[in-house]
A protein has these predicted regions:
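Sec-dependent N-terminal signal peptides
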Residues: 4-13
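Cysteine-nucleophile amide-bond enzymes
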Residues: 15-278
Length: 278
């Protein structure tokens, strides 16, 4: 009798898991993105975050709800649609945000770090930050909504600080960021979640810097890419079939590409080079 009861319970659990997976598959269609306007989308994403043990989940949704609560005002927010249709009006998004806020919100790097904070290990060798983190640090130090992240600002600085390449051959630029992370004993303790970094080259100042960052979650049959586009710009999740789809996603964003003298950009998963634009 006990054996029959145990089998019955297992069957119920399996059916429940299958229903959850079916619901997720219906929502997460490959090639589609969302700004998480609907509560159903947010609740499903929260489940994914909890399953993968991401950090600061409540805080993330507080930031998200705060950004999404106003009328669109020409920013370009929407529910699920094909990823290549997500084109934002930067000025309208900023005006929309600043209508009710006196301090800037976080950006891509702050959001990515917040979600990964408890599963990242990194030695804090550097204590000073450069020009390219100036606005990030202003938010962390002056906006109370980001106090939790600011309490660990040395980890944040060491993860995203700029890199001088004045004395490095251009052919070696692609190795600078992963070598930096390795020198800091960087480790991300998950086999399903990873940090995606877009490293850009400022040829005027011989500098490499992390121009964009996001979180990639492996859902077994697809990937979910979670990002905040920029300061005072939307949050976006995108469903992709493979990591190669990230290359196409970033390729459509002209702001990541400098003049002809600039190398890259370089796309990394944690400390591994995924792609070098040439």
């Amino acid at each position: 009798m006990k054996k029959i009861f145990l089998i019955f319970i297992i069957c119920i659990l399996m059916c429940s898991c299958n229903k959850n997976n079916e619901a997720r598959n219906d929502m997460y269609k490959i090639g589609y993105s969302s700004n998480l306007i609907d509560e159903k989308d947010r609740n499903e994403l929260r489940k994914v975050f909890d399953e993968h043990k991401l950090s600061n989940v409540d805080l993330f949704f507080k930031w998200l709800d705060d950004f999404n609560k106003e009328e669109d005002m020409g920013c370009g927010l929407k529910n699920w649609d094909k990823t290549d249709t997500f084109i934002y009006n930067d000025a309208n998004c900023m005006n929309r945000y600043e209508k009710i806020h006196s301090k800037s919100d976080g950006d891509c790097r702050i959001t990515a770090y917040a979600l990964l904070q408890n599963i990242i290990e990194i030695n804090t060798i550097e204590s000073e930050y450069g020009t390219y983190l100036m606005f990030d640090m202003d938010v962390l130090e002056n906006n109370e909504d980001y106090k939790t992240i600011n309490d660990n600002q040395l980890d944040f600085i060491n993860l995203f600080n700029e890199m001088d390449v004045s004395n490095i051959e251009k052919e070696e630029y692609k190795n600078v960021y992963p070598n930096k992370l390795k020198s800091h004993d960087f480790k991300l303790n998950s086999d399903k979640v990873s940090l995606i970094s877009v490293v850009l080259h400022d040829s005027d100042f011989n500098t490499l810097f992390v121009g964009h960052a996001g979180v990639l979650i492996n859902l077994d049959d697809k990937y979910l890419f979670v990002e905040k586009i920029a300061f005072e710009q939307p949050y976006q999740i995108s469903v992709i079939k493979s990591k190669n789809d990230l290359i196409e996603l970033f390729n459509n964003r002209s702001t990541y590409f400098g003049d002809e003298s600039a190398k890259g950009p370089y796309i990394y998963e944690n400390d591994k080079l995924l792609y070098e634009y040439k």
